Amino acid sequence: MRFSLLLATCVALTFSYTSNAEELIKLQRNHQLTLTEVVRLSILRSPKQAEIQAGKGLVNAKNIQANSFLPSAPAVSAGLQNDAVGSNRNLSQWEVGLDLPIWLPGQKTARTTLAQGAQIELDKTSANLSLDIAGQVRDAVWSLGMAINEAELQDARHKAAQDLLADVEKRWKAGELAKTDVMLAQNGTLLAKAALIKANAEVKHAEHRYWILTGLKELPNTFEEPLNSKEMIDDSHPWLAESAAKIEIANHHRSLSAIEQRENPQVMLNVRHERGAFDSLYNDSVGVAIRVPLDAKVRSAPMMANAEMAIAQAMSEHEQRQRLLESIS
């Protein structure tokens, strides 16, 4: 009964794994391909590259804002006033105005510093992405290597079981062994066959994971690489450098928020073309006015609170990363 069950299981595994194997990619060794090149290509096809490209756009936008002649967009106004509906004394007034915001003290410098910090943060994020992808590639290739070694081991065991079965059958036919010995040998052969099929399937699965990650149908010539001479993790580690850059950018945001607690002052220029009541002639004039918004908690309190929260979150994340790396180093 057990022999029949093992035989049925082995046949089922064979058809199942053969069917799956037909859908997987057969990888070949490329003696010109290096592990470094595999990592580079994997980084380029990472879905997180979309975030990096968006980050470049954000840095560019911050540079535009910092290098702008004005801190925000100007505004144009136009108006007409007459007494046609009212006293009807021939009053008429046309006015066109231009509102120009002006920089607050230190605002332009703070925005420039923020743009520079955003570029540094993006560079650190890109470096951390490279480290993360490199780790995934290493896991993929070494998992594949281990799966290949396991398949070779199971193949050797299966061949040994077949040789043993042939010898036992020969000795049974010669009357030296009982039929039960043959059945035990057949049972061992089927177990070895099932293990071999499973090991080969794991190779296919590992190849598929490698292909999904790298997009390559080729394996590097060797999985080995020189060992880094560093023995201790310091602040230059990409994971820590990224979180440290987030702290810096949060500090820059707080500095800018402290300056922008009130709105930008505005210089308002206007040209007026008017005719007074009962007058027949128009008078043209030019006016200048200054608008200075006042500081109020209704505006500044949420801005500073958000800035402080961002700093606290960045520092907390950095501390967590430090502790995690220290625990595994």
What are the functions of these language-model segments?
Residues 1-31:
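Cleavable N-terminal export/targeting peptides
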Residues 20-75, 102, 176-179, 211-255, ...:
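Bacterial Sec-pathway N-terminal export signals of envelope proteins
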Residues 32, 56, 116-119, 123, ...:
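Hydrophobic faces of stable alpha-helices that mediate helix-helix packing
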Residues 38, 45, 52, 101, ...:
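Amphipathic alpha-helical coiled-coil segments and their boundaries
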Residues 66, 129, 136, 174, ...:
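Histidine kinase transmitter module recognition
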Residues 72-129, 246-248, 253, 260-322:
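Small/polar-residue-enriched beta-strand and adjacent coil segments characteristic
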Residues 130-242, 248-250:
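Periplasmic alpha-helical coiled-coil/stalk elements that build and connect Gram-negative outer-membrane
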